[in-house]
């Protein structure tokens, strides 16, 4: 709740910014939208409103800015749990970032295209682009986007679960946990850890599944996540 006034203040100031013109203003607007959606998943809807307000100005954006706009718009939609229905825009965005992007931008672009295929029920294509996304991650770099990397492995875990591939699911979730901790995202690290129980349950290892649930519940409670603790056990 403490975050909400900050978000609203940012939105008000950015609506004013969106009325300005020039490359710097466009860059600032995109950066602010990205910062807002990174606060938490709920704030992504505020970022979408901001980006929607900027949409009439897209013809004034440079190509690089338009590509970043589309990349961030898809990122915000994904965080807000808005389903994708077409891959046409993200295919163009991926093609652009393959030639012009940083490792983090390429990772995000491939990830978003994978999420598009997830939503249109093309699981093999989703996994292909999730894998491509993880290959872009430069884990030797200090600015590696571990927050995105852990989410990619988390999504891979979900797809492997749906395809009844428990060992692949466990492998993906182990990496999701690892990179969530690197991103200092304790809550999602614990959620990924708890999600491993379904794979052990599928394998008939009921005791292992119960141990994971119990440990996850204790860790959730230790870190103050009582809601998740009650769900876990």
What is each model feature region?
Residues 1-2:
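N-terminal secretory signal peptides that target proteins for export/translocation
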Residues 5, 11, 17-233:
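A "functional boundary" signal
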């Amino acid at each position: 709740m403490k975050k909400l006034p900050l978000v609203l203040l940012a939105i008000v100031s950015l609506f004013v910014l969106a009325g300005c013109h020039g490359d710097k203003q466009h860059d600032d607007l995109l950066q602010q939208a990205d910062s807002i959606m990174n606060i938490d998943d709920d704030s992504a809807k505020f970022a979408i409103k901001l980006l929607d307000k900027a949409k009439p100005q897209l013809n004034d954006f440079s190509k690089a800015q338009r590509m970043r706009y589309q990349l961030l718009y898809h990122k915000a939609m994904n965080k807000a749990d808005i389903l994708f229905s077409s891959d046409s825009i993200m295919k163009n965005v991926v093609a652009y970032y393959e030639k012009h992007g940083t490792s983090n931008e390429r990772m995000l672009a491939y990830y978003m295209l994978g999420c598009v295929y997830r939503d249109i029920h093309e699981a093999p294509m989703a996994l292909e682009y999730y894998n491509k996304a993880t290959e872009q991650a430069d884990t030797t770099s200090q600015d590696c986007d571990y927050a995105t990397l852990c989410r990619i492995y988390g999504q891979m875990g979900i797809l492997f679960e749906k395809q009844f591939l428990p060992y692949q699911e466990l492998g993906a979730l182990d990496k999701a946990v690892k990179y969530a901790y690197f991103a200092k995202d304790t809550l999602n690290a614990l959620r990924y850890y708890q999600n491993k129980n379904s794979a052990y349950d599928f394998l008939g290892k009921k005791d292992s599944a119960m141990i994971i649930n119990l440990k996850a519940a204790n860790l959730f409670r230790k870190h103050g996540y009582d809601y998740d603790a009650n769900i876990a056990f």
